[in-house]
Amino acid sequence: MEHLKATGLDKLIKDLKQPVLGICLGMQLMCKHSEEGNADCLGIFDAEVKRFVPKRHEDKVPHMGWNTITNTNSALFTGFDKDEFVYFVHSYYVPVNEHTAATTDYIHPFSAALHKDNFYATQFHPEKSGSVGERILKNFLDL
């Protein structure tokens, strides 16, 4: 975030009118604030980024692996079937909120994707999610 602010990109990004896609850390930077480094972020999404806190011995952080996503409510997921898997690798998450466009569950439910106006974001990595991720990226390019 410091580099974005130092170069003026923080203001430029918020003013963009074309579709914008943030992936993983990109989604987190689009939120209001992050527990990682106690950083104020872009504030595109009125949401906080929180660190996963394991509840059981088998809960590992970072969360790395394949999860299904549900409640897909965005043009990114056009043609998306239920129970398709996408790949995650992250230690921080965004709680479900008014901008949530898809959810998943690891330790507890969280936002797998966000959408507001021309801004789209995924916590998972579509570029690592095989044909499902390819479809999501194609849907974004078709916006």
Which sequence ranges carry the predicted segments?
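Cysteine-nucleophile active-site neighborhood
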Residues: 1-63
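Amide-donor transfer/coupling interface in amidating biosynthetic enzymes
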Residues: 2, 12-15, 48-143
